[in-house]
Amino acid sequence: MVIRRGEDWGRVAIAPSDLVCASSDAELAAHVGDGKTNIVVTGGDMWRTIGADSRVVVSGESATSLPIDVMKVEFQREDQSIVSKIAVSNIVLRPTNFRGGWLRGSLTVVANAQFLGQWDVAPRGHPNDGRVEVTQVDRHMGVRQRLTARSRLSTGSHLPHPLIQTRSLKNFVCESDDLAQHALWLDGQYMGRVTGLSIEVCSDEAFLWM
């Protein structure tokens, strides 16, 4: 059940015997993809989002269980093959026909976690609200404006901005032709160039223990 505004998140319970640990978002996503649902996180953007707690969780002892949503991702590679993956924190998509990294061209961040590294990219989001926060930077946004926005990202004060669009969605689809292929990152892992992407938010797919 997704969290609603004003409700408490999580519950205190006895930690189960099938706990596994994840020190990064990619490792957390891999556990979920393998069908493991009870996870202790010790690093990554999701870990920071839930409070960066360093407490040791022991099976059979009392701990806090936090349900989270995950993102089921399907994308099409350059060779037209279709790949399905799980992501837990962030998805980054950037056209490959612009040079200059994030300083040039459009940029899309789909966030389930509040943070992307040191950046507070989704201050209004929650990892168990049944939605993702989609932030899209317009390709016409200048370098100086981007540098100014970056300086504000650490505090989440980069919004609102007329050239940065934000949406809260249950599903997200991005399609492009061969002339506008995108580079894709899932939870910090580079997936290569893609020509299509779809994301479905799945609620209560894992429980983080702290």
Q: Language model features by range: what are they?
A:
Residues 1-114:
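Catalytic core of DAGKc-family lipid kinases
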Residues 61-63, 98-101, 123-126, 163-164, ...:
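A general structural signal for short secondary-structure junctions and capping/turn motifs
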Residues 65-67, 101-102, 126-129, 166-168, ...:
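A short, structural micro-pattern
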Residues 68-70, 131, 181-183:
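Exposed beta-strand and adjacent loop surfaces of beta-rich binding modules
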Residues 84-93, 106-119, 132-136, 174, ...:
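Short hydrophobic-aromatic micro-motifs
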Residues 89-98, 116-122, 157-160, 184-186:
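Glycine-rich, charged/polar anion/phosphate-binding loops
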Residues 102-157:
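Internal helical hairpin/lid segments
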Residues 136-210:
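ATP/nucleoside-binding phosphotransfer catalytic cores, i.e., glycine-rich phosphate-binding loops
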